[in-house]
Regions:
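P-loop NTP-binding core
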Residues: 1-288
Length: 288
């Protein structure tokens, strides 16, 4: 389970969650994308659905769906190997329900332990850009790592450190119950070549290297991903066309990486054990 988290909205979590899921699916992995942004569902609306299940995140968390039949909960996207669980809480009832439930913060973690979800190679969980019980239960559902997303703007990074890291600090007591706080892989999204972005990136690296992000840095691990996602129109085009961005741009004459290269490098950093599959997909791209 790989949550994609930032307590600040507008950082690009949903877009990159969907793009990563699409790349992994095209590489032959069986992927489930869960739209955990109950207020503004975006991740699972990027790709068209071939089948929309009658239930979604709401019923999964409220424990009112029979998981023995996958079609009750699992929707199928137009992308082969990519299934989704839709966000379906338009009245915003889940936060209050999970806040008041004794097991609210670990309910998603427990739900995803069902045999139904063991059939997937990767489960990516998008989240809302806010500090809430919903973000907490998504973080606690992780099986080891999560992706943090921030733009190369110091105020945005400070908000990530102030909001997301503080949220993780508040979850540290769960370690007493055997629930480990996930290591955070910070992804810089919407990178640019201007001097301000470059300076901001250098400052971000320094903060992380010096472990100045938390007084509990010995218990909360953050590292900066080498892959940078540049601020390119092709990512908007992918959203509009409803296809994974790596399909739209395999090669480029720009200085920055192509969309395919960016997704390839990101996937290799996060899932080195499947690099052969990613290499095979890259070879297919070269022959296209």
């Amino acid at each position: 389970m790989l949550p994609v988290v930032s307590t600040k909205g507008g950082e690009g979590k949903s877009t990159q969650s969907a793009n990563l899921a699409g790349f992994l699916a095209d590489a032959g992995l069986r992927v489930l994308l869960i739209d955990g942004d109950h207020a503004q569902p975006t991740a699972t609306s990027i790709f068209p659905l071939e089948y929309e299940a009658p239930c979604g995140l709401y019923e999964l968390l409220m424990q009112t769906v029979d998981l023995s039949n996958p079609d009750n909960t699992i929707s199928r996207s137009s992308i082969k190997n990519l299934d989704v669980i839709i966000s379906n809480d338009p009245r915003n009832l889940l936060p209050t329900a999970m806040q008041n439930a004794a097991d609210g913060r670990i309910r998603l973690r427990n739900a995803l332990s069902h045999p139904l979800f063991c059939t997937y190679d990767v489960i990516i969980i998008d989240s809302q850009g806010s500090r809430s019980v919903m973000s907490e239960l998504i973080i606690l559902a992780s099986t080891g790592e999560m992706i943090g997303v921030a733009k190369p703007i110091l105020p945005d990074v400070r908000e990530f450190l102030r909001g997301t890291v503080r949220l993780m600090e508040e979850l540290l007591p769960y370690s007493a119950f055997g629930i480990r706080i996930p290591d955070t892989r910070l992804l810089i999204n919407c990178m640019d070549y201007d001097s301000l972005s470059v300076q901001s990136l250098a400052e971000i690296k320094k903060i992380i290297e010096d472990r100045r992000y938390s007084q509990h840095a010995d218990k909360i691990s953050i590292d900066l991903l080498s892959t940078l996602i540049y601020d390119l129109t092709v990512y908007v085009q992918g959203h509009v066309k409803g296809v994974p961005v790596h399909r739209l741009e395999k090669k480029t004459t720009r200085v920055s990486d192509s969309a395919f290269s960016s997704m390839y490098l990101l996937a290799c950093e996060l899932f080195p054990e499947w690099k052969e599959k990613f290499d095979a997909l890259a070879e297919e791209g070269e022959g296209a």
